[in-house]
Structures are given as structure tokens and as C-alpha cells.
């Protein structure tokens, strides 16, 4: 029993540490925006999608009474909100960004209205919300597949981040174990694609080393 309790604590701690580490990766973008007072080379859409993901899992955790989900996604949502506000501040073309943000808020309001008004049964609400969060998280993990196809076509991994790949693997594996321990299929299944795509990236790093890319470009110049 003590061993099981220690293992649970280890998994819970890993989920918190690795996930918050993933969320704080945006701090480098925030620092870049503040130093350059611009949004050059900073993508806005990942901030929005991660915000939706955080708020969805936060609602799921609150409905389920899961403290780990609540803490992690509260911090994550706060960080994404900070990144979004900073982007809005430094972005010269605010109209498009404001439209995307307003669309996000509209979708969130519709979602909350549906789950809390049209699904009165708490158990059914939990299952439907869990399914939504799971599908959304899976789509986020699978969305970079276009980049992986580009790597294969160009035989270059310059567009991939090795540290981010490691962080994604550790985070996904931690949440898979967390979902397995809680027997929660929504948490477990939604994070499995993160493990798969991480191993695909590792294979691509092995197949097309970045050092090889640098040598190739040096020869071309």
C-alpha cells in the first residue's frame, strides 16, 4: 500500500512538473515580444488552442473534483491568458487577432451553455465533457503531423525542437499513467498520441540529424 501511495505521488508530481514546464515554454515567446516589442516569429493560434484545452480540462477537473487537473490547468490557463494579452498588445494588426479571440470566447460560451444548461445530469455531463476534452487534446497532438511530413520531404529536422519533443513525451507518458491509475479513459487515451508522435519525432531526429543539416547547408554555401 505504501509502495502504491509512493508511486501515485510520483506520478502526480511528474504530471504537475512536466506539464507546467510545457506551459512555461511560452515564456520565451513572451520575453521575445517584450524585448523586440513585436510578434515576429511568434504564432498566436497555439496560445488560443492551448487556452481552450486548459479551460476544458479545468472544467472537467472541477466537475470530477480532481485537484491535480484543477491546479495544473488553472496555472496553464493563466499563462495562456498572459501570452494572449501580450500578443494583443504588441501585434500591429489587432483586428484579426481580436476576431480570433472573440470567436474563441463565443465558442467557450456556447460550450458552457450546452454542458451546464442542456445536460443537467452530472454523470452525463462529465462523460460528454471528458469526450470533448479528449478529442480536442488528440487533435492538438496530431496537428503537427504536417510538419512531420515536411521533415520527410525536405529530409531536414530544423523545424523540430528536440527539447520540446522530450517534454512532450514525458508529459504525455505521465498523464497516461495518471489516467491509468485513476481508470479514466479520457485522460489516458487523449495523451497516448503524444507518446506516439514523440517517438516518430525521435526517429526523424535519428534519420535526419540536425548536425547533418548544418553540414549540408555549409557545403551549399
UniProtKB/Swiss-Prot annotation:
Start and end residues of each stretch annotated as Mediates interaction with TRPV2: 149-221
Top-rank taxon of the source lineage equals Eukaryota
Quote the subcellular location field of this record.
Golgi apparatus membrane; Cell membrane
Q: Where is the MtN3/slv domain?
A: 10-94, 127-212
User: Repeat: is it a keyword of this entry?
Assistant: yes
Tell me the tissue specificity. Ubiquitously expressed with highest expression in oviduct, epididymis and intestine.
| Membrane-protein topology | Multi-pass membrane protein
Keywords of this entry: Cell membrane, Golgi apparatus, Membrane, Repeat, Sugar transport, Transmembrane, Transmembrane helix, Transport
Give TM regions: 3-23, 42-62, 68-88, 96-116, 129-149, 160-180, 186-206
Family the entry assigns: Belongs to the SWEET sugar transporter family.
Q: What is this protein for, i.e. what is its function?
A: Mediates sugar transport across membranes. May stimulate V(D)J recombination by the activation of RAG1.
Name the record gives this protein: Sugar transporter SWEET1
Originating organism: Homo sapiens (Human)
Amino acid at each position: 500500500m505504501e509502495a502504491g501511495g509512493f508511486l501515485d505521488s510520483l506520478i502526480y508530481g511528474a504530471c504537475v512538473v512536466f506539464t507546467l514546464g510545457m506551459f512555461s515554454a511560452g515564456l520565451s515567446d513572451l520575453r521575445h515580444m517584450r524585448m523586440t516589442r513585436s510578434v515576429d516569429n511568434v504564432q498566436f493560434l497555439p496560445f488560443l488552442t492551448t487556452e481552450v484545452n486548459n479551460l476544458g480540462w479545468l472544467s472537467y477537473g472541477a466537475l470530477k473534483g480532481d485537484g491535480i487537473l484543477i491546479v495544473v490547468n488553472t496555472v496553464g490557463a493563466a499563462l495562456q491568458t498572459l501570452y494572449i494579452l501580450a500578443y494583443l498588445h504588441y501585434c500591429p494588426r489587432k483586428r484579426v487577432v481580436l476576431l480570433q479571440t472573440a470567436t474563441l470566447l463565443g465558442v467557450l460560451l456556447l460550450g458552457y451553455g450546452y454542458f451546464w444548461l442542456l445536460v443537467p445530469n452530472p454523470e452525463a455531463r462529465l462523460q460528454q465533457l471528458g469526450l470533448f476534452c479528449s478529442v480536442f487534446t488528440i487533435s492538438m497532438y496530431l496537428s503537427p503531423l504536417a510538419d512531420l511530413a515536411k521533415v520527410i520531404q525536405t529530409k531536414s529536422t530544423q523545424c523540430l525542437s528536440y527539447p520540446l519533443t522530450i517534454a512532450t513525451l514525458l508529459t504525455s507518458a505521465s498523464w497516461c499513467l495518471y489516467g491509468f491509475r485513476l481508470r479514466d479513459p479520457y485522460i489516458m487515451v487523449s495523451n497516448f498520441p503524444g507518446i506516439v508522435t514523440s517517438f516518430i519525432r525521435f526517429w526523424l531526429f535519428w534519420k535526419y540529424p540536425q548536425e547533418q543539416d548544418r553540414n549540408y547547408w555549409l557545403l551549399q554555401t
